[in-house]
């Protein structure tokens, strides 16, 4: 499971010109579910993200977690994070989990973010063509791959 985390001051996602998710201060998370991912990876990733201290404190040090700043999360499913660009010019997406596996894990991940103390979790619509806009704060952008976590 892969996540791209962006610290934002505002973010929203639209489907068919209608806003389906919107947050203020928090994280915009692009989530890619790979073949072989399970709830174990979702649990570990949600816990890692909820506890990640990348908001600045009064001394301008990255020392505060999402809950410390009363932040929210906007989670967007994004199979393109699973792209393999090692051959040719067209990405290969064979590492991405099939929708019948990825969608339930996406929903489970969103629930686990909430279970880890994040009150407001907004979502895009799995599999939809979405328009995502954000105001990046910093910018702070972090990539997390559960294959790199000790779980």
PLM region descriptions:
Residues 45, 76, 140:
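Residue-level signal for inorganic ion chemistry
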Residues 114-130, 135:
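Divalent-metal-activated hydrolytic enzyme cores
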């Amino acid at each position: 499971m892969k996540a791209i985390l962006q610290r934002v001051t505002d973010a929203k996602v639209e489907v068919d010109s209608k806003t389906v998710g919107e947050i203020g201060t928090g994280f915009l998370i692009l989530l890619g579910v790979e073949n072989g991912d399970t709830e174990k990876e979702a649990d570990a990733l949600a816990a890692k993200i909820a506890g990640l201290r990348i908001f600045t404190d009064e001394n301008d040090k990255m020392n505060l977690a999402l809950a410390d700043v009363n932040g929210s999360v906007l989670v967007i499913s994004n199979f393109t994070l699973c792209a393999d660009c090692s051959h040719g010019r067209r990405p290969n997406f064979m590492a991405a989990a099939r929708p019948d596996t990825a969608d339930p894990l996406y929903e489970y991940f969103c629930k686990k973010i909430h279970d880890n103390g994040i009150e407001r979790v907004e979502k895009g619509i799995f599999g939809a063509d979405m328009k995502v806009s954000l105001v990046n704060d910093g910018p702070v952008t972090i990539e997390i791959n559960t294959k790199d976590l000790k779980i």
